[in-house]
């Protein structure tokens, strides 16, 4: 039973989000780490993300039955009572929000609530099923964890937080489109209006290129604005150029599914590399680059 309650929280998604939280937190810490705050932030974000995933599993039960990759999820197979899952999700979410408020600050809590509402209330309940722009809306919630980590330290939404929001939002788009391409039949069968299904894979490839170019600019801005150092800059430039090259190769591929899967895998390598480098190579920016929103 414990295994099912763990699975419904999507541990893989929680782990991926924690890597970005660590990146944002350590970037803001500038080498001076408040360990109790660090642990509390990781736990708080984990609980909120877990809550969102459980709610998402509850909402998506009907379409999860249709899709090959989701047909064996806990709620689809009836291993947990749906009503119990709602209570479970609520407890997780409330615990995470309270912890962020008590151990971090009100801004971190507010960002967590906004990310949660966008993911569950806007994306999962409506946009995912009704609009080709659902991925764009979902990308905003996906970018919340690193910003929460950053603001847990700073207590303010400044230029650094804005750049992090841009980096992780822009990264989500080609990452998600790649999934939609190599899982094309799943999304088509479930009538989920993702861009590759609605506009075609060729159009999706064009969008992927544009988003990676924008992602590249955003990643470099973190160093140009003085928030990260030259080591970060070199890695950011390298992974962005490589990712762009992989995306461009999609115009010549004979197998879109294999190409998209490779692009998806490298997207994880890219964002993990950036999270690591911003963690170990932070800089203190000039005041000229700071825009405070307290």
Curated annotation (Swiss-Prot):
Record's catalysed reaction(s): heme b + (2E,6E)-farnesyl diphosphate + H2O = Fe(II)-heme o + diphosphate
Name of protein: Protoheme IX farnesyltransferase
Family, per entry: Belongs to the UbiA prenyltransferase family. Protoheme IX farnesyltransferase subfamily.
Keyword field: Cell inner membrane, Cell membrane, Heme biosynthesis, Membrane, Transferase, Transmembrane, Transmembrane helix
Something else known: Carbon 2 of the heme B porphyrin ring is defined according to the Fischer nomenclature.
Molecular function as annotated in GO: protoheme IX farnesyltransferase activity
InterPro entries noted in UniProt: Protohaem_IX_farnesylTrfase, UbiA_prenyltransferase, UbiA_prenylTrfase_CS, UbiA_sf
Bilayer-spanning residue ranges: 13-33, 35-55, 84-104, 107-127, 132-152, 162-182, 208-228, 229-249, 264-284
Entry EC no(s): 2.5.1.141
Superkingdom of origin: Bacteria
UniProt subcellular location: Cell inner membrane
Pfam family, one: UbiA
């Amino acid at each position: 039973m414990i295994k099912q309650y763990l699975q419904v929280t999507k541990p893989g998604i929680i782990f991926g989000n924690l890597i970005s939280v660590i990146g944002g937190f350590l970037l803001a810490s500038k080498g001076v780490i408040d360990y109790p705050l660090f642990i509390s932030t990781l736990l708080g974000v984990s609980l909120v993300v877990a809550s969102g995933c459980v709610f998402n599993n509850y909402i998506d039960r009907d379409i999860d039955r249709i899709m090959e990759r989701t047909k064996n999820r806990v709620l689809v197979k009836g291993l947990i009572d749906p009503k119990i899952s709602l209570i479970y999700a609520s407890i997780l979410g409330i615990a995470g929000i309270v912890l962020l408020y008590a151990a971090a600050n009100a801004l971190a809590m507010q960002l967590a609530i906004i990310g949660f509402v966008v993911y569950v209330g806007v994306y999962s309940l409506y946009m995912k099923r009704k609009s080709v722009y659902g991925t764009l809306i979902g990308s905003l919630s996906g970018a919340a964890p690193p910003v929460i980590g950053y603001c847990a330290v700073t207590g303010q939404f400044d230029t650094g937080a804005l750049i992090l929001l841009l980096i992780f939002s822009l990264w989500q788009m080609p990452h998600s489109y790649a999934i939609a391409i190599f899982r094309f039949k799943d999304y088509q069968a479930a009538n989920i209006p993702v861009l590759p299904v609605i506009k075609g894979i060729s159009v999706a490839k064009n969008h992927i290129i544009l988003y990676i170019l924008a992602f590249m600019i955003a990643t470099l801005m973190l160093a140009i604005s003085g928030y990260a150092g030259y080591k970060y800059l070199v890695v950011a430039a390298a992974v962005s150029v490589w990712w762009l090259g992989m995306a461009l190769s999609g115009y010549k591929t004979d197998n879109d599914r294999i190409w998209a899967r490779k692009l998806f895998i490298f997207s994880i390598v890219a964002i993990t590399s950036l999270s690591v480098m911003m963690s170990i190579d932070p800089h203190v920016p000039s005041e000229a680059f700071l825009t405070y929103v307290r």
